């Protein structure tokens, strides 16, 4: 196989892997139309139907499905903890705005990252809960609170925000948000006191409303923004907004969670253990969707009280924390079909970071470690290329000898390879084996929130973003040129031009890659150059020694 075919084979194989990886991953949904200017201008039909727990509940009239979606607003309750700045509306006790104090905005890092907001610019994203049946409060009813400002005091480990609703029939409902220090898991409780003369048989629902907008950027490939749920039976499932638009989800389960996933962050409702639940999705208007869970609570007799607890995880996709919150929540960190490779890579990378306390240095050390693991394969590849380099003059003479008779030329080349014990594919296959590791590391550096705004040194202050001055891509291009010089020079002028242009093309590609990935590739190239130079020198010495012995 000649140099041209080798180049085409490598490029084609790499392209197929990248395209397959891209196809396997859910694509980012198209931007929704900007017809609405504020969340309040949209119509509302967001109350789910009641769950059916018994024959009596089956006869109970569910809340009728309304058309459209309207998000109304009343008094706001402001909450501040070590991790959050939150805003709760007294209508429904909805969580209307949520800022993450430990994570900063992409455009202005003096501002907190806004995970949830009830405005449609840049996006509508709220968490709602409610009770259905017997006139109990849905997320449209007005609650009261003793205060409009709550703050987690120094030395305190938790903060309770209590909202109260009292019905005309005597039923009293308390909705309590419990924020805990150093935790992104918010406890949301209902205390239902039936002070009426008749039994009530309600259902409880938890849902997230989103308008299919996303301000999360990505590099070269889109990242997923959409719904997700997990059960022990079905495991982790994702639901794109286009899927929600086509059909409503209705999935019964006895465990699991439901939520919304976006680049680096996730919000998930985790109902109380043992509570039978139905996961659902609903298209509320042209671009507004809800995804949630509804559960029957059973009969609550007069004079009886019931307490129900659930959790809302709303925060970064920090893998160590996700595993401890709920089973399957760690799957929201999506590394695609190469998760089996990416997961241990991230574990090694994070273990190194805990020692060196710098993600950039950790990437460099991981690169060295990967290079050591693949050293035998790389050495075989470079040794094959070095041998091909030594044969280049003889190959040129064969081409001149046989001219356009490609069949005889091919036979002569194969005979020469056999005599010299050289595999022309020897320089290609070891490289192909390493490509899945490269792709897996790409998704680790792109999809891990730990990389977001992680500084390295000097001008690299965000390893998840592109190099602002393109220094790393340019340096990487220079190393590729050096590698090209170390490889066998193609006899065909067209092939030589291709080899000259490739470093420029790859450098342009890497202009749009995260700086952390370019750093990995740059360090890998530098190590490869050192290894290839050493092997070339060794091969040249061996060839010279062989010629000297032949003269004797």
Swiss-Prot record:
User: Which keywords are on file for this protein?
Assistant: Cell inner membrane, Cell membrane, Chaperone, Membrane, Protein transport, Transmembrane, Transmembrane helix, Transport
Output the Gene3D superfamilies linked to this UniProt entry.
2.70.98.90
**GO CC, one annotated term:** plasma membrane
Which CDD domains does UniProt cross-reference here? 5TM_YidC_Alb3, EcYidC-like_peri
Mention one GO biological process in which this protein takes part, according to its record: protein insertion into membrane
Q: Which GO terms describe its molecular function?
A: membrane insertase activity
| InterPro entries, A to Z | Membr_insert_YidC (IPR019998), Membr_insert_YidC_N (IPR028053), YidC/ALB3/OXA1/COX18 (IPR001708), YidC/Oxa/ALB_C (IPR028055), YidC_ALB_C (IPR047196), YidC_periplasmic_sf (IPR038221)
- Membrane topology recorded in Swiss-Prot or TrEMBL: Multi-pass membrane protein
Homology family: Belongs to the OXA1/ALB3/YidC family. Type 1 subfamily.
Which PANTHER family does the UniProt entry name for this protein? CYTOCHROME C OXIDASE ASSEMBLY PROTEIN COX18, MITOCHONDRIAL, OXA1
Name the chain's protein: Membrane protein insertase YidC
- What is the source species? Methylobacillus flagellatus (strain ATCC 51484 / DSM 6875 / VKM B-1610 / KT)
